[in-house]
Curated annotation (Swiss-Prot):
This enzyme's EC code(s): 1.6.5.-, 1.7.1.17
Organism name: Sinorhizobium medicae (strain WSM419) (Ensifer medicae)
Family: Belongs to the azoreductase type 1 family.
Cofactor note: Binds 1 FMN per subunit.
Protein name: FMN-dependent NADH:quinone oxidoreductase
Cited function: Quinone reductase that provides resistance to thiol-specific stress caused by electrophilic quinones. Also exhibits azoreductase activity. Catalyzes the reductive cleavage of the azo bond in aromatic azo compounds to the corresponding amines.
GO molecular function terms noted in the UniProt entry: electron transfer activity; FMN binding; oxidoreductase activity, acting on NAD(P)H as acceptor; oxidoreductase activity, acting on NAD(P)H, quinone or similar compound as acceptor
Catalytic activity, as annotated: 2 a quinone + NADH + H(+) = 2 a 1,4-benzosemiquinone + NAD(+); N,N-dimethyl-1,4-phenylenediamine + anthranilate + 2 NAD(+) = 2-(4-dimethylaminophenyl)diazenylbenzoate + 2 NADH + 2 H(+)
InterPro entries: Flavodoxin_fold, Flavoprotein-like_sf, FMN-dep_NADH:Q_OxRdtase_AzoR1, NADH:quinone_OxRdtase_FMN_depd
UniProt xrefs under PANTHER family: FMN-DEPENDENT NADH-AZOREDUCTASE 1, FMN-DEPENDENT NADH:QUINONE OXIDOREDUCTASE
Sorted UniProt keywords: Flavoprotein, FMN, NAD, Oxidoreductase
Binding positions for FMN per the UniProt entry: S15, V16, S17, M94, Y95, N96, F97, T138, R139, G140, G141
Cofactor (UniProt): FMN
Complex and partners: Homodimer.
Taxonomic placement: Bacteria, Pseudomonadati, Pseudomonadota, Alphaproteobacteria, Hyphomicrobiales
Amino acid sequence: MKILHIDSGILGEHSVSRRLTAAIVSQIKADRPDADITYRDLASERVPHLTGAQIMAPADLEGVDPDLAADVRIGRQMLEEFLAAETVVVGAPMYNFSIPSQLKAWIDRLAVAGKTFRYSEAGAEGLAKGKKVIVASTRGGHYSVAPASAMDHQETYLRSVFGFFGITDIEFIRAEGLNLGADQKQFAIAEAEKTIAEGNVFKLAS
């Protein structure tokens, strides 16, 4: 089993999303010691955002500036890691009602026509079918119910973009209300970790 583990939280050891993705991957490893895990820390790697030059670069990169060529190769490697993975574990904190810009930059490297999606006369078709995506979703407030749910451009975006890639098996393990007091934070984390510890994650990833 190939696992791709992605962290995007910028708070380092204080990041709850990192804590949860580590627990998810640890649970999978305990049940599947043979799991082959690739890890990327998008906050420390500082994935460059897309540029016109990157998009227009020739496939063979002949004559391309060395820095631009390196940027293109990073994107290609990220795409190959994603395509090779059977299960993708993503740490996705909510920042200002959406996802971290680092995570968006990574997703932009995955959204490649002919690789993760294609267009035909019938419309768009996802090409990354058969994968499992597990998202550790963390939020300072409560956004899973109305009226605040209208401001959720985090989970809704991730479900949409992975769905666009053809992935229908998407699970969110959520810890929200983290900024609403110490008791609420402790409760939310404990509930998320309980879900992971019960082994539900491995069943989803198998």
